[in-house]
From Swiss-Prot:
<keyword id="KW-0469">Meiosis</keyword>
<dbReference type="GO" id="GO:0010780">
    <property type="term" value="P:meiotic DNA double-strand break formation involved in reciprocal meiotic recombination"/>
</dbReference>
<dbReference type="GO" id="GO:0006284">
    <property type="term" value="P:base-excision repair"/>
</dbReference>
<dbReference type="GO" id="GO:0006302">
    <property type="term" value="P:double-strand break repair"/>
</dbReference>
<dbReference type="GO" id="GO:0006281">
    <property type="term" value="P:DNA repair"/>
</dbReference>
<keyword id="KW-0464">Manganese</keyword>
<feature type="binding site">
    <location>
        <position position="241"/>
    </location>
    <ligand>
        <name>Mn(2+) 2</name>
    </ligand>
</feature>
<dbReference type="GO" id="GO:0007131">
    <property type="term" value="P:reciprocal meiotic recombination"/>
</dbReference>
<dbReference type="GO" id="GO:0008408">
    <property type="term" value="F:3'-5' exonuclease activity"/>
</dbReference>
<dbReference type="GO" id="GO:0030437">
    <property type="term" value="P:ascospore formation"/>
</dbReference>
<keyword id="KW-0479">Metal-binding</keyword>
<keyword id="KW-0158">Chromosome</keyword>
<dbReference type="GO" id="GO:0000014">
    <property type="term" value="F:single-stranded DNA endodeoxyribonuclease activity"/>
</dbReference>
<dbReference type="GO" id="GO:0097552">
    <property type="term" value="P:mitochondrial double-strand break repair via homologous recombination"/>
</dbReference>
<feature type="binding site">
    <location>
        <position position="213"/>
    </location>
    <ligand>
        <name>Mn(2+) 2</name>
    </ligand>
</feature>
<feature type="binding site">
    <location>
        <position position="16"/>
    </location>
    <ligand>
        <name>Mn(2+) 1</name>
    </ligand>
</feature>
<dbReference type="GO" id="GO:0000723">
    <property type="term" value="P:telomere maintenance"/>
</dbReference>
Amino acid sequence: MDYPDPDTIRILITTDNHVGYNENDPITGDDSWKTFHEVMMLAKNNNVDMVVQSGDLFHVNKPSKKSLYQVLKTLRLCCMGDKPCELELLSDPSQVFHYDEFTNVNYEDPNFNISIPVFGISGNHDDASGDSLLCPMDILHATGLINHFGKVIESDKIKVVPLLFQKGSTKLALYGLAAVRDERLFRTFKDGGVTFEVPTMREGEWFNLMCVHQNHTGHTNTAFLPEQFLPDFLDMVIWGHEHECIPNLVHNPIKNFDVLQPGSSVATSLCEAEAQPKYVFILDIKYGEAPKMTPIPLETIRTFKMKSISLQDVPHLRPHDKDATSKYLIEQVEEMIRDANEETKQKLADDGEGDMVAELPKPLIRLRVDYSAPSNTQSPIDYQVENPRRFSNRFVGRVANGNNVVQFYKKRSPVTRSKKSGINGTSISDRDVEKLFSESGGELEVQTLVNDLLNKMQLSLLPEVGLNEAVKKFVDKDEKTALKEFISHEISNEVGILSTNEEFLRTDDAEEMKALIKQVKRANSVRPTPPKENDETNFAFNGNGLDSFRSSNREVRTGSPDITQSHVDNESRITHISQAESSKPTSKPKRVRTATKKKIPAFSDSTVISDAENELGDNNDAQDDVDIDENDIIMVSTDEEDASYGLLNGRKTKTKTRPAASTKTASRRGKGRASRTPKTDILGSLLAKKRK
């Protein structure tokens, strides 16, 4: 591709590269970094002005030396060179880069010769952790090879500051918002805690581009970021985290901006969304013209074929005939392998490499099989199927995933949870595990077991939501001190609360102590952010022609003369701009859009987008810290719907809590039987230290 003209900003867009995914696998271990290298070579060969990466560059927040080496090598080969970077930075980068020393863009550093700058945000996989709250993107920023922007310092008070660029007559405002837990971000937007700083707007002078990394669709009422929460001055939103590639712009008619969902560059789960063709995108922006987007297919993607069948739909199969079922499934897999190999040959022939490859790359194959009992008979017997691992091992050496070619699952039946299960209602029986296993599509995660166990237990001290998240950090992100730190923090908080309760200090009754502890636990689980009293925002032009921001009858001026703040209104979820009539600018000019129109219906009450307290309810606030499974990180994925359904059931079960009783009620209840437990003994000893 030729060089862009002096007034065109050319951007390569990518997201969810997941370098390091499954890197110990002898067949697919190098797929992620090879594709990332291809992406960056496309940026170099197409003479782009910058690369924008919308999260999850690495698959884990502690990447291996191999993954880190491959990324550093690729960035050095593709981003450094003699070609000058023609972008002029107009804003103060120290407001965006939250570092002590490296507060400038890397291409303006005299110690580096950067030809293609990379701007990236952190995702949910490579997020910050540890005492210093550092993530892999911080390390790359310190090396000078990446510009890490969009960091979130406080999740309940977020200020989104753009980087302002100019090339010729074209001006670009680049916004970034790193990954925040979806429920928490939903609550922050709802409470008016998100502030956008916007450049001076004149007749569409600025092209406003934003990168986010959140759920795009609702797994629960609050576990996603609605497009309606984003301000309407944006022109385009790059949506990371979702792995399905949608190779066209989708227009939001309510907010009047376009949404691009690039998808992942490597298949991290064997599901339908990952089976779609994968692209990177080149965006050309020129002042006065509609943006031009060009999708470029990725060539290093391993061929992936997926098929779903139901044994009920095969008339000649009988539930008890295991051999006939296995024979039929083998035929289906053989057909999928033939189709995948033909597609790989065609791809190599188009690239001119058909005769140079000694062996075809092995494809990824996934056959999902519903083995539920036939619905047209009274027999409750399910189809007899072979062990999935043994069945899959037939194809070792011919497919890339020789251990999980087939996935057996049953249709979900209505779930009725018993209050008592096993001993004291806190244990999970083999039948419970089997039910969870079948509901999750044959692949069970530790997170699902922990969530189900906590729903059946009646913890009197630790909040289940926080404990669930601590276990996830311990298992998924190898944070060995996550559980210890969480328990120590919660005990310290609750002991501090109880030490100020005079009635608790006076009583020695164990039952009364337990009742008071439950109240403290409920209060500790729900920490709502108080809504701001006045979020109304007004804009006016001052004497210098620059915007100023007024909120709550106070005038607040920003530090940069080119940027003005914009608050997200707590009532309507949009940015209100009311300007003086004497200098009222015209609205954003209508661009000729080539985007696919998608009619977005008005959100009903069931989606809980409105900020009315009676619609959201206390239960949603109480469960704002529920962590939703990231289906895109599963080595062999289940359906997102299956995973979210199990968590949603847990959520509904958990929200049925009794209202907090008063201390007087607790006192009367404590006059009955009395029994001491190790938990109350521990609290008693801690409180004794407090008394001293």
